[in-house]
């Protein structure tokens, strides 16, 4: 079935809610706001802000309601699904797994909403997070072959599967408990001081997964003279990983 909610519109409303309702920090802000300041700089409270990086890749979900829908036996009708890129199309999924292995919080985020009018209602009622599903790429694991693979789920059940060969996924996060689940996960890590040194290190980690050649990082860095370190990290997250980079406050 044709998608009625685009990744662009969903990504905007989800990010807006995480920032304005949950207090997450943006990393594409102008100089001097929240993320990205000189090492040792302090905020108005007298201490440099601290937090944890969060990578979100937005996935538009297909709404399946016909009786011949292939995965209906798993979760019933209607249901949602989103596709993972084949290996020959993109190494995107593997890159996200490698990013997760470096200790960063990484999720696919997808809506349990298929009509634009429902997305609008969720946006104004601040229910976008609650109407979403979050899946760790590492939970899905490496794709075993070049066949089409999809994540299948329903708005009425907590069961989530990865197909083509159906396998139930554990550890997925349904939106209503997302903020608390992320808070528990990052509580096990040391909060990072959100200064230029941190964002430059984060940028280096991202580039190293694309190419171990330091020259690539230097070339990318050459054009960021008028860009804060946090904005540059956000730029790399978007261009190299197709992700939104946010900061979960400590």
PLM segments and residue spans:
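Extended, basic/helix-rich recognition subdomains
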Residues: 123-250
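Acidic-basic catalytic patches of nuclease active cores, encompassing PD-(D/E)XK
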Residues: 1-33, 99-102
């Amino acid at each position: 079935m044709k998608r009625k909610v685009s990744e662009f519109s969903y990504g905007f409303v989800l990010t807006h809610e995480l920032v304005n309702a949950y207090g997450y920090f943006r990393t594409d802000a102008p100089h001097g706001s929240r993320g990205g300041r000189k090492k040792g700089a302090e905020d108005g409270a007298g201490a440099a802000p601290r937090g944890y990086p969060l990578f979100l890749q937005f996935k538009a979900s297909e709404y399946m309601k016909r009786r011949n829908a292939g995965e209906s036996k798993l979760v019933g009708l209607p249901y949602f699904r989103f596709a993972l890129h084949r290996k020959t199309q993109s190494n995107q999924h593997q890159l996200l797994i490698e990013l997760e292995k470096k200790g960063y919080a990484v999720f696919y985020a997808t809506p349990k909403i298929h009509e634009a009018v429902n997305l609008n209602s969720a946006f104004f009622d601040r229910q976008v997070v609650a109407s979403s599903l979050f899946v760790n790429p590492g939970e899905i694991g490496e794709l075993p072959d070049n066949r089409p693979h999809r994540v299948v789920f329903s708005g009425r059940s907590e069961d989530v599967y990865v197909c083509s060969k159906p396998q139930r996924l554990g550890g997925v996060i349904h939106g209503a408990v997302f903020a608390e689940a992320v808070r528990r996960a990052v509580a096990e890590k040391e909060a990072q001081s959100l200064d230029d040194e941190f964002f430059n290190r984060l940028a280096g980690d991202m580039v190293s997964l694309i190419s171990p050649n330091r020259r690539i990082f230097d070339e990318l860095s050459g054009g960021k003279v008028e860009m804060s370190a946090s904005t540059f990290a956000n730029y790399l997250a978007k261009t190299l990983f197709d992700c939104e980079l946010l900061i979960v406050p400590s």
